[in-house]
Amino acid sequence: MKRYLQACSLLMLLLAPIACGDGNSAENRPPTPNSGQAPVFRTLSPPEAKALIEARKDLVLVDVRSPQELSEGSIPGSQLIPFAELAQGRMTLPTGRPLLLICAVGGRSYAVGQYFSGKGYGEIYNLAGGISAWKAAGLPLQRR
């Protein structure tokens, strides 16, 4: 129960900037690779994310939804690392390669991206609107 409360507290803390943001985002700028200077954390629209997937063969697609949510479909090539596992420290994100984070509607992946970007992960992208927006854009899904 204590770990659950800690995970919920972490989620609330990380989602606060979303609720309090000014609405400005970097969604209209094209993605740029990290030059090793400062960590990159950007939110991308589904078409931008698809273009990044096609352009960056070293990109790791990380789906932070729960295993039960995969029945809705997943982006081909994505790997499941559930948010709950990350929040409880039982799993971590891959290092040394750029990451595209995916969840149901973009909130959990944004929180994970903010957290790991603050930990020094170099290049992290968040899928705006999550798998719901990806699906609404008519982009390919796979069933697991």
For the regions a language model picked out, list residue spans one by one.
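Hydrophobic beta-strand scaffold positions of dinucleotide-using enzymes
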Residues: L61-D63
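Rhodanese-like catalytic fold shared by cysteine-dependent sulfurtransferases
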Residues: K2-S9, L13-D58, P67-P98, G107-R144
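Short, surface-exposed ligand- or partner-binding patches at beta-edge/loop junctions that are enriched
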Residues: I102
